[in-house]
A protein has these predicted regions:
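C-terminal helical subdomain
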Residues: 170, 219-263, 273-277, 281
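Short, flexible, mixed-charge acidic loops at enzyme active sites
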Residues: 149-155, 209-214, 251-260
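Pocket-edge positions in alpha/beta enzyme catalytic cores
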Residues: 47, 71, 225, 268-271
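Short, contiguous pre-domain boundary segments
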Residues: 2-8, 259-269
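A short C-terminal helix-loop "cap" of Rossmann-like NAD(P)-dependent dehydrogenase/epimerase domains
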Residues: 157, 213-222
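C-terminal amphipathic/interface module of NAD(P)-dependent oxidoreductases
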Residues: 267-293
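Rossmann-fold NAD(P)H-dependent dehydrogenase/reductase core
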Residues: 1-210, 288-293
Length: 293
């Protein structure tokens, strides 16, 4: 692994003039900063948001060529409808996510975290792939280290539900998805690349929406003491979206929570090509969306 000298920030973004980027979950937190900075660099940016009103409020504070379109990753019909509205796109940033929420199901019957964080983005990426010219960046987390994929019980029907383990599973799935996507793109002879990023420990609205009366106040207090800004947390995503990288790069702060931005390691489970392939095939069956190239 090599490190960019100094501390890379969004100020180092190259020009995105003439390019189109989609950022999911762009109405707040890391997604908002990612969209704003890409627009500042000259990109045409589509803010893909479940709540259009919040998306429009975020858009009002941005300059450049930006627009909001509805996308609910917990509803595959919404994912398909969104994909149908998209023309050519250069960069897709799979940023949206939920964290450690109480047990609930998506509209399609998936456990909400694996459904939103992984399966929704899996379907979106494959539906858009014929229209993507450059790369796909998926936001994972250090919490992938706590994750384990249960291919027989992805939706926590047989296991006692654990909000944090379910979150870790979904973030591990993001990395396995990225690796298998990169492999399939290369095998298809595509010039499109796939990368992942993690923000370190950034204070965002995710920690305030766990739905846990004990956990939420704890994380909000931790944010004030230890959390970096969303501006800092978006830097790995922006790096992954803009730099010349080997396929399947994983970008984050060097020291985990903080540090210079560059390639970082991942857990042994996240490096399993066998599990990545099995998860991909299961995801195709569950979403009824296949690799299109």
């Amino acid at each position: 692994m090599s490190w960019t000298p100094g501390s890379w920030t969004s100020a180092d973004l190259p020009s995105f003039a003439g390019r189109t980027a989609i950022v999911t979950g762009a109405n707040s937190g890391l997604g908002l900063v990612t969209a704003r900075e890409l627009a500042r660099a000259g990109a045409r940016v589509i803010l893909a948001c479940r709540n259009v009103d919040k998306g429009n409020a975020a858009l009002a504070g941005m300059g450049g060529d930006v627009q909001v379109r509805p996308l609910d990753l917990a509803d595959l019909a919404s994912v398909r409808a969104f994909a149908d509205t998209i023309g050519v796109v250069d960069v897709l940033v799979n940023n949206a996510g939920i964290m450690a929420v109480p047990n609930a199901l998506t509209r399609d019957g998936f456990e909400s975290q694996i459904g939103t964080n992984h399966l929704g983005h899996f379907a979106l990426t494959n539906l858009l792939l014929p229209k993507i010219s450059d790369r796909v960046v998926t936001v994972s987390s250090l919490m992938h280290y706590s994750g384990a994929i249960s291919l027989k019980d992805l939706n926590w029907k047989a296991r006692p539900y654990s909000a944090w383990l379910a979150y870790g599973q979904s973030k591990l799935a993001n990395l396995l998805f990225t690796s298998e996507l990169a492999r399939r793109l290369a095998a298809a002879g595509s010039t499109v690349t796939a990368h992942a990023a993690h923000p370190g420990y950034s204070a965002t609205n995710l920690q305030g929406h766990t739905g846990n009366p004990i956990g939420t106040p704890f994380w909000l207090a931790a944010n004030k003491l230890f959390g970096a800004s969303a501006e800092y947390g978006a830097n790995p995503t922006l790096y992954a979206a803009s730099q010349d990288l080997p396929p399947d790069s994983f970008i984050g702060p060097k020291f985990g929570a903080r540090g210079p931005i560059g390639p970082v390691g991942r857990s042994p489970l996240a490096r399993s090509s066998k599990t990545a392939g099995e998860l991909w095939r299961l995801s195709e069956r569950l979403t009824e969306v296949e690799f299109p190239l």
